[in-house]
Design a protein with these regions (language model features):
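Hydrophobic/aromatic-rich core segments of domains that either
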Residues: 105, 109-115, 119-125, 134-144, ...
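Short, acidic Ser/Thr/Gly-rich low-complexity loop/linker segments typical of extracellular
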Residues: 284-305, 595-613
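Short Pro-Gly-centered beta-turn/loop motif in secreted/extracellular proteins
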Residues: 301-312, 317-320, 326-329, 607-634, ...
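Short, ordered, surface-exposed loop/turn motifs in non-cytosolic proteins
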Residues: 268-287, 308-309, 576-604
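Secondary-structure boundary elements
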Residues: 29-149, 185, 369-371, 375-511
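Short active-site neighborhood of thiol/selenol oxidoreductases, capturing the structured segment around
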Residues: 686-710, 714, 727-731
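A short, hydrophobic beta-strand/beta-hairpin element that forms part of a small beta-sheet core
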Residues: 778-796
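Short, internal strand/loop/helix patches
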Residues: 744-779
Length: 813
């Protein structure tokens, strides 16, 4: 008996010790599962709180804790990094899914025996095995949808890669440059934490080492890189903004030389203005885009650290506005006086981006060769999966579409439904949503199909809401009654969705709470469910309904029916040689000025001066800003701003500033250089291919975003380049890269004058780097040369509108 009593006492002591040690372990390692779930709910944006059950977040926290316990680096990750960069499910504005579990099961054995840095590289190889780059629309696919599709734009690739890294317990975050300074467009990539330090990598674009990607050079010319960190984060980085849901931090110091500008805002008497909004704007896509927005403190001050280039400061308070160009690295203290004057009627501004800087990490030839071998193998795995897809537009979602077409009774309207939703919808839409949109009506009119039949309202994740609303709102017989229902029942929360995530329409109905965008999506979704044509106006973002041949704006505050008070604007432009038909977002944009702030009019990407503005376009009455810009090969931009007021018929002169400088010889390249011709498999000289005269030489990389962009930009000018008639020689650096390239994707879109080949032993690349004094081997590189060995144009790295830049040079030759 004594022995039994002794054993019982010992067991109690052991259990007590286990409990105490468990508590100490939890204190050292972090918090309990419920504490992490509570942390998520404390800072969770409203749509995530309403659209997903608590069990979803509990499961994902369990998976995070499992990865922490099972991965060899789990105990080395500090609590701050684990809490903010592993536990959160959301990366960007994607639809949340169960990728953490799927990815962990696929990756855990692949990375278990590796160091943390090697594990990051290995995860990126896995990502490349499944996903490559291809542009798409603004809605961000979920990680599992991207996996199913096998491609995505950079925002989707980086969301996918961050999700994969977090699944195995590696802290990771998506880094975004909201806009490049030296060219149009933006970019997103990944930072991952290992052994006490953050490293960057190109998502789904594996390199042999960390801190290396095609964007190194572009990033060195960047002016702002940021990331939104879930919750109240207290790391060492500069804080740009704190909201109820996230902390936005500035990480530009990791990529480029920086400087700080301190801003003081004063009133007419020179007294500091508290609470003035100061927007830091970067020229991109033919507008001054706000990359940072700050409020002045009690002393009227704020600041920003950025790359050493030009921005436009735009300060507003109570309708008063002041703008001023600043140069980071030159200007240190800037005072903006809100003196009651509005924007100047017209002004010319020259914007200069930062220069190239920075050094690339060392990569041995052996490392590069092994990485190329692995990438070729990974390409083959992905292509084998893609070969199973019978319909390109449906990608990996083809079984869902086939099921729908087999089950639907109204075949004609089923085909119309598939034609009015986006291509991205076809790739990830669920069977439930398709069946929810079945109709017994046969109406193929544009109004019905686009604004009643289609479930797509904006950039929201599609859900099966129509049958739900027909049941719940069956008492509503007029669209005016639906507006009244929204007015009386839906409250607006302006604080708990700062990212403007799209709240599901059924959640809005259940919660009776959302933000302005959520209310608009809800209204349109409910209206279509009840048979009322409705939309969100793609230009000004206002919700509208269609009645009696007229579109009416929805006003949740007023009872009366209001059609838009429209006037006609005509842009008077005299075409010049290089810009016979300026393009929206490339050469010009229009913004409406509301309380001193510029609100961009979001016309379709294909909008042009001749097609949309030459003969007049209807706009609401008010004050507007016309921005035009001419971007030079150096990245510098010649900007013109024109402010005007619309009332009745209004004509505004449209000005494109020109750079009339003739092409100059800037270097040399031996036209007798040999390359391996892709078609003949023979070595040939450039001269023997091009004949005497000018030609274009491009050194490109397979399946990389900068090259893909460049080739697509060139394709826009296919006809003009064929009329020019000169050859364009496009070379890969080696045969491995040439074999990895998807010729089928580009051959039909490029000019017939294109010749493909491989640089023999890298001789041409070496000469280009030396002769053009290029500091890095970033690709692509495009040159305009002649066979007398003269180079008159050179552009390296990531750029937008390359085709236009080449044509400008060609027309001057």
């Amino acid at each position: 008996m004594k022995s039994v009593k002794y054993n019982e006492d010992m067991m109690k002591r052991v259990m007590m010790a286990v409990v105490l040690l468990s508590g100490l372990w939890l204190t050292a390692m972090g918090q309990t599962r419920e504490a992490y779930v509570d942390f998520l709910y404390q800072y969770m944006p409203l749509p995530d709180r309403t659209d997903y059950p608590r069990t979803y977040y509990e499961k994902n926290v369990d998976l995070s804790l499992r990865a922490r316990a099972e991965m060899p680096w789990g105990s080395s990750v500090p609590e701050r990094e684990f809490k903010h960069f592993v536990v959160p499910v959301r990366v960007n504005n994607e639809n949340l899914d169960n990728s953490r579990e799927v990815f962990y099961n696929d990756l855990k054995d692949r990375v278990k025996g590796l160091s943390m840095k090697d594990a990051i590289l290995e995860v990126n190889h896995w990502c490349h095995e499944h996903v490559t780059y291809r542009p798409s629309d603004a809605r961000t696919s979920s990680p599992l949808a991207t996996l199913k599709t096998a491609y995505g734009r950079c925002g989707e690739q980086s969301t996918f890669t961050v999700a994969a890294l977090r699944s195995v317990g590696i802290p990771a975050r998506q880094v975004y440059t909201p806009r490049w300074a030296h060219t149009d467009d933006n970019h997103a990539w990944v930072e991952a934490w290992a052994d006490g330090k953050w490293y960057f990598l190109g998502a789904c674009e594996p390199e042999p080492v960390l801190n290396l990607g095609w964007f190194n050079e572009s990033a060195s010319r960047g002016m702002l890189m940021h990331t939104k960190v879930f919750g109240h984060y207290d790391g060492p980085e500069e804080v740009m903004e704190r909201t109820a849901c996230f902390t936005e931090i500035n990480v530009i110091d990791n990529y480029a030389p920086t400087s700080r500008i301190d801003v003081l805002v004063v009133d007419e008497q020179g007294k500091p203005v508290e609470g003035a909004k100061v927007e830091f704007k970067l020229y991109n896509y033919a507008e001054f885009y706000t990359v940072a927005k700050k409020l002045t403190d009690g002393a009227g001050r704020t600041f920003l650290t950025a790359g050493r280039g030009d921005m436009l400061l735009w300060a507003t308070k109570d309708g008063r506005v002041k703008i001023q160009k600043v140069s980071f690295g030159k200007d240190k203290d800037v005072t903006l006086q809100l003196d009651g004057q509005q924007l100047p009627k017209r002004v010319d501004i020259d914007i200069v981006p930062p220069p190239v800087s920075g050094m690339l990490p060392d990569v041995t030839p052996e490392q590069r060769a092994e990485n190329n071998r692995r990438m070729a193998y990974e390409d083959s795995i992905r292509k084998a999966y893609e070969a199973t897809m019978p319909v390109e537009d449906w990608r990996g979602n083809y079984q869902t579409i086939e099921q729908y077409l087999a089950q639907t009774k109204n075949k004609a309207m089923a085909q119309r439904l598939l034609s009015v939703i986006s291509k991205k919808d076809l790739r990830d839409i669920s069977l439930d949503v398709l069946l929810d949109n079945e109709t017994t009506v046969t109406d193929t009119s544009d109004i019905y199909c686009r604004y009643v039949l289609s479930p797509r309202v904006e950039n929201e994740w599609l859900t099966p809401y129509k049958a739900f609303f027909r049941k719940e709102l069956k008492g509503i017989k007029r669209v005016e009654d639906l507006i009244q229902w929204c007015r009386q029942n839906v409250k607006i929360d302006r604080e708990h969705n700062p990212q403007q995530l799209r709240m599901q329409p059924m959640s809005v109905y259940r919660e009776r709470l959302t933000d302005n965008l959520g209310r608009n999506i809800f209204f349109v979704s409910a209206a279509r469910s009840l048979g009322f044509p409705a939309r969100i106006n793609e230009v000004n973002g206002k919700p509208q309904y269609y009645k009696g041949g007229t579109w009416y704006d929805v006003d949740y505050e007023q009872q009366a029916e209001v059609s838009a008070d429209l006037s006609v604007l005509r842009l008077a432009y005299h075409p010049i040689e290089h810009y016979d038909n300026p393009k929206y977002y490339i050469h010009f944009t229009l913004s409406k000025l509301v309380d001193g702030e510029a609100q961009l009019l979001t016309y379709p990407e294909e909008a042009t001066w001749k097609g949309d503005f030459e003969n007049g376009v209807e706009l609401e009455k008010g004050t507007y800003l016309l921005t035009t810009g001419t971007r030079l090969a150096s990245g510098k931009v010649l900007v013109h701003l024109e402010q005007f007021t619309i009332g009745g018929q209004t004509k505004v002169d449209f000005t494109m500033r020109e750079d009339n400088e003739e092409p100059q010889v800037i270097g040399s390249l031996n036209a007798e250089n040999l390359y391996a011709d892709h078609t003949s498999k023979m070595q040939k000289s450039i001269l023997s291919t091009t004949g005497r005269g000018f030609y274009i030489l491009g050194i490109v990389a397979p399946n990389q975003e900068p090259t893909n962009h460049a080739l697509r930009d060139i394709s826009i000018y296919k006809q003009q380049m064929e009329q020019w008639g000169r050859k364009m020689v496009l070379l890969f650096q080696n045969e491995d890269e040439a074999q990895r390239f998807n010729y089928q994707e580009f051959n039909n879109m490029l000019p017939s004058t294109v010749v493909w080949g491989t640089d023999v032993d890298g001789r041409i690349m070496k000469e280009v780097l030396e002769q053009m004094k290029l500091s890095s081997p970033s690709l692509p590189i495009f040159l305009v040369c002649d066979t007398f060995n003269r180079v008159v144009f050179c552009l390296q790295g990531y750029t937008i509108n390359l085709g236009e830049q080449l044509m400008k040079v060609i027309r001057k030759l």
